Amino acid sequence: PVFKKVSHRLCGIAVMAIVSVTGFSQLVMTDMVSNRGLYLSLFNPMRSYQQYGSIACFTRSIKLSVPEKPNGYSLKKVEEITSKYTSDTVDPNKKRPNVIAVINEAFSDPQVLGDIETNEDYMPFIHDLMKNGNCVSGTTYASIVGGQTANTEYEFLTGNSMAFLPKGTVAFQLYLRHAMPSLVTELKSEGYTGNSATHLQKARNYNRDKAYPLLGFDKFYDYTNMIVPFVKMRNNATDQCTYDNITHDYEQQRKSTDAPYFGYTMTIQNHSSYDVPFDNFDDKRIVVENADATDLGYYLSLIKYSDEMFENLINYYKNTDEPTVIFLTGDHQPRIHDESMDSITNGEWRNWNDEEMMRRYEVPFLIWANYDIDKKTVEKTSMN
């Protein structure tokens, strides 16, 4: 009898072990959960937990927390690739320019999607600057459309690619746990001061309050500690308000040092949605005349304001004696309604192949300087 009881227990344990291992491998180590429609929102995970339950979301999060090693990756291969390149030498006596980096929320030019006719140019200053100005400009590709802004920030600031991380993840939230080499740390090693990040929203969004310091930023201005008055369009801080925060931080640095300045901002003015009226915003300033796309017109009205405010930033540094470089790009294209996409593409976008669908990921970029540089156009590049 004792032997039978022990045997039954051992069999039970064995069955439970097999079920547990099988369940773990299916739920965690495969895409079974995501293939059944579970989307774990990393911007608002609580919503996902409420919708799908703790077990499903927890198992999905385990799968996302361990990136798979890319095919062919090895330290030896990395060293082999990098050995072909040598570092550029920099004259230590040459004055380094101030660097202002702007990633503008949802900034893009929808002409890449279709022939869009509007009542007036929605970014006349930037269009002219890219065509005739003292700048390098072109097209870059975001890894996202309509959301997950922090992934563009991650690629731009670190030089890493989201291509090697699981789809739908946000690097700031899942993978940035220790100090990481970045554009910020590189500039700091060259003697840059300021090294401030400005994002006039909640600091905890996308874990920025923890991610920015790990990337080397000395200061992070959000809407609670900004050094200029908060001015909003709709419910978001204007681009002008954001740029004023940068220039005031720059001026504060100049009271104590003449070392080159670095300031970075992720704006918020143009965030979705694009169909809610506000008393403090003219949503019909730009009208799309050849398509039924009111949300696109609303969005382009925001871009018109962005264009004017960016011109103000350029003019500010035009009138300084210090060499300054300003970089501008967008984090992603806006997420406009499918019906609007149908109207501006005659429905063709629904049948685009992979290469054609890349148009949804195009955003313009420019690098302007207040001193002479070699003007050129870059056909395409990536955020990193």
Name each model-derived stretch.
Residues S83-N93, A101-N104, D109-N384:
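Solvent-exposed soluble domains appended to multi-pass membrane proteins
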